[in-house]
Amino acid sequence: EKIIFVWPEGILPGISQEKIVDYKWLFENHFNENHLLVLGINSKSVQRDTVKYFNSLSVYDHSLNLLSSYDKNNLVPFGEFLPLENILKNIGLKTLTNNYQSYSKGSERNIIKINKSNTSLKFLPLICYEIIYSGRIFNNSDFDFIINISEDGWFGQSIGPKQHFIH
């Protein structure tokens, strides 16, 4: 039986796409070829002397081979990026996201397509509050389902989780 495990963003603090392979032994011992793992994880891109960090949704097989990844397009101001960062860092406001610089925006949203071991699925990847932009994201309806990963625990007992669920 095929099983997709979906874990929220931030579930593995301090572990990025490049570091998750350090845990390959754990996944190989507890997951099998019928399992896929979808999780929120930080990723980075290095081009020349510029490092960009992304809030990403990544899909792995049971051996932690990266099958596909999506970088969040719509970032939360003051939560994932610091507006006017170049000005505000001069007064001490430099980092907001686990001591990284601001996250960078992903460049595009593509349907994630997985074709592996008799498994074929297509889903629309969303991270957290991107679901509220549904008018803009449903232009391409060539997917089987939506996976929206979110870590709403920081909302506490506020109205935030209820508002998020409505969308």
What are these regions (language model features)?
Residues 4-167:
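Solvent-exposed soluble domains appended to multi-pass membrane proteins
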